[in-house]
């Protein structure tokens, strides 16, 4: 599972829409499952599933009926290796919706509706599933249930998943690999552990002195602050220590491997 992590406006949705084939690239080459999107056929599209941030409601449909109907469009793309579509009853069980099979969609709760969205996204047994901000607006319980569902798809059924999120905890919990985006560019790439190691110890100390603002990156923020007060005393104001974290890297729009600008104030 791969997570595209970044703040609002970083380019996550634009990136995933290009990969899904919903938006044209402005330049370069984009391949998904070995196919240039400009040459993507219906056979290729049957190998890809998507769960969007928003949907057009099918409130009058019953859950099982809608899955069976949508699944029927994939039957002609069945192969010896991949039997399409997913059986509606089996899919309901996978998505945790069996007891709601005969409900009208408008009667589902928000969490149940998002489970149905995922079921719709995988009804054709895609090799690759795109999830765009899938847990936006979820309460903690619904978020945990959704995480369990996504984990099951990846681990039990071998579905490759690419999701976008601005939630670092979600990215760390779900993804084996994280790409951090900012301003439409990838500024970091690796596992959560690898990214954390790259910035380990690089705290950022901010302060003002005589009306001037200063910033210092250091691996020993406590000692640095002590020496700062030792040298300048009460003239130091607005002291702030920002501990190193991936969240800070995303918010600051910096590369996890780049060094922060160094404005040294302490005399050597």
Regions found by a protein language model. Name each.
Residues 20:
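Helix-to-loop junction immediately C-terminal to a conserved catalytic motif
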Residues 129-132:
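Catalytic Walker B motif of ABC-type/P-loop ATPase nucleotide-binding domains
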Residues 189-190:
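ABC ATPase "signature
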Residues 144-157:
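Helical segment within the ABC ATPase nucleotide-binding domain
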Residues 68, 72-75, 82-100:
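Conserved ABC ATPase "signature" region
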């Amino acid at each position: 599972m791969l997570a595209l992590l970044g703040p609002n406006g970083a380019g996550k949705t634009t990136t995933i829409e290009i990969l899904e084939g919903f938006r044209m690239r402005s330049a370069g080459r984009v391949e998904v499952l070995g196919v240039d999107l400009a040459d993507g056929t219906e056979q290729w599209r049957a190998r890809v599933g998507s769960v969007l941030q928003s949907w057009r409601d099918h409130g009058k449909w019953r859950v099982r009926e809608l899955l069976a109907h949508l699944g029927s469009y994939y039957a002609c793309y069945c192969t010896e290796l991949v039997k399409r579509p997913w059986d509606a009853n089996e899919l309901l069980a996978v998505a945790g919706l069996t007891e709601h099979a005969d409900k009208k969609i408008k009667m589902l709760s928000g969490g149940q509706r998002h489970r149905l969205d995922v079921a719709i996204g995988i009804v054709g047994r895609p090799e690759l599933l795109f999830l765009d901000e899938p847990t936006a607006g979820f309460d903690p319980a619904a978020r945990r249930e959704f995480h369990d569902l996504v984990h099951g798809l990846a681990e039990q059924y071998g579905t490759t998943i690419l999701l976008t999120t601005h939630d670092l905890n979600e990215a760390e919990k779900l993804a084996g690999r994280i790409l951090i985006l900012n301003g439409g560019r990838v500024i970091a790439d690796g596992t959560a552990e690898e990214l954390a190691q790259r910035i380990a110890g690089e705290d950022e100390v901010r302060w003002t002195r005589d009306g001037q603002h200063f910033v210092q990156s250091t691996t020993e923020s406590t000692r640095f602050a002590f020496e700062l007060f030792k040298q300048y005393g009460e003239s130091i104001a607005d002291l702030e220590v920002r501990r190193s974290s991936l969240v800070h890297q995303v918010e600051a729009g910096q590369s996890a491997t780049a060094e922060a600008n160094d404005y040294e104030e302490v005399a050597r």
